[in-house]
Amino acid sequence: MFAAIASGNPLQLSVEVPNSNGLQHTIVLSRTKPKLYSHITLFILPNVTFPQDYIATVYFKLSPQEEFKLFGYLSSEKPSAIFKVQIPSSKKDAGDTSDGLGEIDMDVDDGSGAADPFTDTNGSSSNNISELIIGISIEPREQGMMKLEEWKASMNAEAQKNNSLILSRPNLGIIRNITTAGQLAQVYPSLTQELAAKIVQHAYNYLSGFLDAQGNVPIKRFDTWWDKFRNRLANDGTFLDEVTKN
């Protein structure tokens, strides 16, 4: 009923799950060539008439011991889809999951763009991941689409969470949310001192060009420096690395 193909590998047909009344299927993609693949095309076979009131939800996992994870669907109006598989290069990478399954982007329909290949936990190409298991469940359209909407909402919530400012303290493995200058100074005291010194030195370098005969600087010159400093910091904070004593 379904088939999948990965670059450099033969076509694999789906197998009906026993006692599922034809509503559940699996496809096992085993690597048969040394070429690594990162895009998987899944489709309904041309000779199959898929009922319009149903959709086929698509799941992935990397081993029989893992739980299936929802990542998309097929239907009569959408008989095929391309999925991009990205395995994290390290278990500590952002977005890594405990079961080793990395990001699978739903419906990369044009198949364009480079994608990371399968990699081991050291970041090098590896054959340690020998198969990828696709699970397909035929469900009533309303039920399946509701499940997909819930999945999308959870993915969006996770993405927003990952976009927050999170810093880790070296050697302690502590992950903290840094929201104030005081918290930053507590977690990274040496780095905070260096940052403060860079800011003061930048101000000194600028203001020293406006000293009067008594060694004073008009306050408006400081205001001008502060406005320029904030604008430059917003555009590219790395300029602070170049601040040195005059």
Curated annotation (Swiss-Prot):
Present with 1910 molecules/cell in log phase SD medium. The lineage of its organism: Eukaryota, Fungi, Dikarya, Ascomycota, Saccharomycotina. Keywords: Cytoplasm, Lipid biosynthesis, Lipid metabolism, Nucleus, Phospholipid biosynthesis, Phospholipid metabolism. GO terms for biological process: inositol metabolic process; phospholipid biosynthetic process; protein import into nucleus. Pfam families: Hikeshi-like_C, Hikeshi-like_N. One of its GO terms (cellular component) is nucleus. Belongs to the OPI10 family. This is Protein OPI10. The keyword Secreted does not apply. PANTHER family: HIKESHI FAMILY MEMBER (PTHR12925), PROTEIN HIKESHI (PTHR12925:SF0). Involved in phospholipid biosynthesis. The keyword Amino-acid biosynthesis does not apply. It is found in: Cytoplasm; Nucleus. GO terms for molecular function: nuclear import signal receptor activity.
